[in-house]
Amino acid sequence: MAEAKTLRAEDASSREVWDRFIKSHEESNFLQSWDFYEFHAARGKKVVRRLFFRDKTIVGAYAGVVETAKRGTYMAIAGGPIVDWTDKKLVKAMFEDIRTEGLKYDCVFVRVRPQLELSDKSLKLMAELGLKKAPMYLSVEFAGVLDLKKSEEEILAGASQGFRRKLRKAAKNDIEITAETSDAAIKEFCRLEKLHAKRQEYVAFSSDFLTKQFEAFRKAKR
């Protein structure tokens, strides 16, 4: 009989090791990147980065940020954990670790938004892990995956009629998309976001929040 491999968890200390594992999972995104939590640390927040090993092989990871709110201190894990969800032993160990880390920082609850498609199967799994549906979404209410390997024509063919109409309107108005890294660019972005928030009646992110996020990714040349 083959000897069972030892499962253990530890704090991550290497950006290179962390990002290599996160990038190896196609479902992952910037919400579990090293730099996203450098941004939170720059805000003065406590961050958690945990790696899970079977012997010397990394098999799972999650990053979270400790937030304070009127309803109490909590930890938010957006876009994670990154794990093989069919590995029940690993998933159980990971959520036990999440609970332990939350208690370490005096959190009264943990908010999790994994990279799973919304389905009866995924909801059943969350319930089995002791999770409850949150009254408010974390990061975004709806998320999708856009296959950039497809041609522009194929992408547009799969888009909604309303989306295609907006693209045609943007082209008619000579709207261009550019990538900027200057301080002036983020200031202008913050100004426009506040105008949009006022028009659409939602609460905008603060300029400090957006600027620190911008600076974290600019520093890493992302």
Language model regions located:
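A conserved beta-strand-loop-helix scaffold within acyl/acetyltransferase catalytic domains
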Residues: A4-R71, P114-E141, V145-R222
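Acyl-donor binding region in acyl/amide transferases
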Residues: K70-Y137
